[in-house]
């Protein structure tokens, strides 16, 4: 892919909707900045975003299983 093609590829920052050039030199892509990247991470931590799917139940652990070996 040529450099001119790479510089034309733009996406919107998921946080602030600013146009962002998609190229390897942009360390924050698809975000425009570290700030927008951290805002998005905070949204995941706060439970604002979820990934749909089925929850798997884990097997019960009894006391003897928890003993140090």
Curated annotation (Swiss-Prot):
The gene is yacG. Its cofactor is Zn(2+). PANTHER family: DNA GYRASE INHIBITOR YACG. Inhibits all the catalytic activities of DNA gyrase by preventing its interaction with DNA. Acts by binding directly to the C-terminal domain of GyrB, which probably disrupts DNA binding by the gyrase. This is DNA gyrase inhibitor YacG. InterPro entries: DNA_gyrase_inhibitor_YacG, Znf_NHR/GATA. Gene3D superfamilies: Erythroid Transcription Factor GATA-1, subunit A. It comes from the Bacteria. Interacts with GyrB. Binds 1 zinc ion. Zn(2+) binds at residues 13, 16, 32, 36. Pfam families: YacG.
